[in-house]
Design a protein with these regions (language model features):
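Acidic, Ala/Val/Gly-enriched low-complexity intrinsically disordered segments
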Residues: 2-4, 11
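Extended, low-hydrophobicity, polar/charged segments
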Residues: 9-175
Length: 175
């Protein structure tokens, strides 16, 4: 029976999505979003949003509207750079801005221990450890942007101005 097959697939997919929403990293993001503005919702995608291109394809939006959350290691701590999906973070600009000689990309283990998220699902909010945030001004081209919500299949949509307010990030030119 076609109805039973469709219904069975729906229940399987819905169950998978519900399981994902209950994962601790996503729940941390949900809590922060709800405390900030309860109209902000985490969405679970059927396909991966691990890369900006994947996310844009899944959401049918421009790659530039995707927020890449990139953790950098500095001489003394970590800093999270939020960059438009169609841009590349300039380590030289970040070094100059921070007046530091040594700034590099954090490795997967550092990302996990600092933020509590795995690469591909790093949210701009709800990190395990307090992290300074820089937001590239190129994201301001978009009224609304999409950011990871703790897992490669989860995202949330947020107004650019709200992203600045929520993260308390400093808007800078870092691409």
């Amino acid at each position: 029976n076609v109805y039973e097959i469709i219904n069975s697939n729906f229940v399987t997919i819905f169950g998978w999505m519900e399981d994902l929403l209950n994962k601790e990293p996503i729940q941390r993001v949900v809590k922060v979003l709800n405390n900030f503005d309860d109209s902000l919702k985490v969405e679970i995608l059927n396909s991966s949003a691990r890369t900006a291109k994947d996310a844009a394809t899944s959401l049918n939006c421009e790659v530039g509207a995707i927020v890449k959350s990139l953790l950098l290691r500095t001489e003394s701590n970590f800093i999270l750079c939020l960059v438009s999906g169609d841009k590349r973070c300039s380590l030289n600009k970040v070094k100059k801005l921070l007046n530091m000689k040594d700034v590099s990309m954090a490795d997967a283990e550092q990302v996990k221990s600092q933020t509590g998220f795995s690469i591909g699902g790093v949210s701009p909010v709800a990190h395990l450890n307090r992290t300074e945030i820089l937001i590239d001004s190129s994201l301001s081209r978009y009224e609304n942007v999409y950011a990871a919500a703790g897992h490669p299949n989860s995202i949330f949509k947020i107004a650019y101005k709200q992203l600045i307010e929520l993260t308390k990030g400093k808007e800078e030119e870092i691409v």
